[in-house]
Amino acid sequence: MKKKILLLGSGELGKEFVIAAQRLGQYVIAVDSYDDAPAMQVAHEKEIINMLDGNLLDQIIAKHKPDLIVPEIEAIKTERFYEYEKQGYQVVPSAKAANFTMNRKSIRDLAAKDLKLLTAKYAYASSIDELIKATEILGFPCVVKPLMSSSGKGQSVIQSREEISKAWEASQTKGRAGAAEIIVEEFIPFESEITLLTVTQKNGKTLFCPPIGHRQERGDYQESWQPAAISEVQLKEAQRMADAVTKELTGFGIWGVEFFLTEDKVYFSELSPRPHDTGMVTLAGTQNFNEFELHLRAILGIPILEITLERKGASAVILASTENKTPEISGLDIASGMSESDFRIFGKPITRPYRRMGVTLSYSTKGEEISSLRKRAVLLASKIKVD
């Protein structure tokens, strides 16, 4: 069962996916907008195109005739996926899922209005005047997000009326779609955030990974740990919501479903129809299969009987602090001296401030507390420099 996989997006998540695919004898063509992207370094072939250009996407599909089209990022002309499905191509997890999750408006309305899931109160704004009206309804603080963005780009937390103009400007210049409509959300005073990795299968039941806790800065993942502290009642509710939304979107693969937890409530936040950055903690051997192996097996139709927690783990990101076209790596010798720890350097060809260049991992089978594992992962990340 050797499949030709066209990977659209070739970042660090794509790289680990390709490694998983190589281990099961699959053939991968890695695509991105720049050369020497991480996944290209381990794939069989590469293509460099602007994936927001539908005509270029069509050409790549016609050239390679892949068995599977696997999106890894949001910046893709996903509207073309419907046509590819009509032509007989398998889009992962489905054309519907890729299109709905590309746009926060589509997925939020689906979750809140159609599926009646609990979410933060929200409004949309297409002008600064509409943003002002939205803040008057939702109050301060509130959160502003472009409808199309990732890794916190263009997001702001508005604390007062004086910050509205700056937040509007950021939303219009840093999102994927440029000047466009935005979503404004009430700020939920949450106790924690979790990612519930959810696996939908062609040949098996829907499975849930042990919940992953995470911490963000600038709207982007900084740390994650597994398992996260969560009550049985909250876990069941999160699983119910994740099951409902993934069933509605259809398809097979792994989904990163994010939730806010308060003392007595679980709020649906966002969803990604692919491996999730916070799920890199599974590279620490926390599960019987890491998230990339799970994604691959699900899309290939290889049955996954169960997902088990093997040990506790934590991860922390290694960020660049400067812009450099010839980055240097240092500190690996120091970092390698820490027990029950590991690291991954992604191999991105260029650095810029806050760009994620690697991840550190810590783990324990001896009952070590999550707080201790988190500290070790963060300490490890501070020792490694990629600049």
Curated annotation (Swiss-Prot):
Q: Which InterPro entries match?
A: ATP-grasp, ATP-grasp_carboxylate-amine, ATP_grasp_subdomain_1, PreATP-grasp_dom_sf, PurT, PurT/PurK_preATP-grasp, PurT_C, Rudment_hybrid_motif
Reaction catalyzed: N(1)-(5-phospho-beta-D-ribosyl)glycinamide + formate + ATP = N(2)-formyl-N(1)-(5-phospho-beta-D-ribosyl)glycinamide + ADP + phosphate + H(+)
Top-level division of the source organism's lineage: Bacteria
> Any keyword Nucleus?
no
Tell me which residues bind Mg(2+): E258, E270
Pathway terms, separated by semicolons: Purine metabolism; IMP biosynthesis via de novo pathway; N(2)-formyl-N(1)-(5-phospho-D-ribosyl)glycinamide from N(1)-(5-phospho-D-ribosyl)glycinamide (formate route): step 1/1
EC number(s) of the enzyme?
6.3.1.21
Q: Does the keyword rRNA processing apply?
A: no
Gene Ontology MF term list: ATP binding; magnesium ion binding; phosphoribosylglycinamide formyltransferase 2 activity; phosphoribosylglycinamide formyltransferase activity
Q: Can you list the GO cellular component terms from the UniProt entry?
A: cytosol
Q: Which keywords describe this protein according to UniProt?
A: ATP-binding, Ligase, Magnesium, Metal-binding, Nucleotide-binding, Purine biosynthesis
Name the GO terms of the biological process aspect: 'de novo' IMP biosynthetic process
Give binding positions for ATP: R104, K145, S150, S151, G152, K153, G154, Q155, E185, E186, F187, I188, E193
Ranges where the ATP-grasp domain occurs: 109-300
Where on this chain does N(1)-(5-phospho-beta-D-ribosyl)glycinamide bind? E12, L13, E72, D277, K348, R355, R356
Cite the record's note on assembly.
Homodimer.
Role of this protein: Involved in the de novo purine biosynthesis. Catalyzes the transfer of formate to 5-phospho-ribosyl-glycinamide (GAR), producing 5-phospho-ribosyl-N-formylglycinamide (FGAR). Formate is provided by PurU via hydrolysis of 10-formyl-tetrahydrofolate.
Family of the protein in this entry: Belongs to the PurK/PurT family.
Stated name of the protein: Formate-dependent phosphoribosylglycinamide formyltransferase
Source organism per entry reads Leptospira interrogans serogroup Icterohaemorrhagiae serovar Lai (strain 56601)
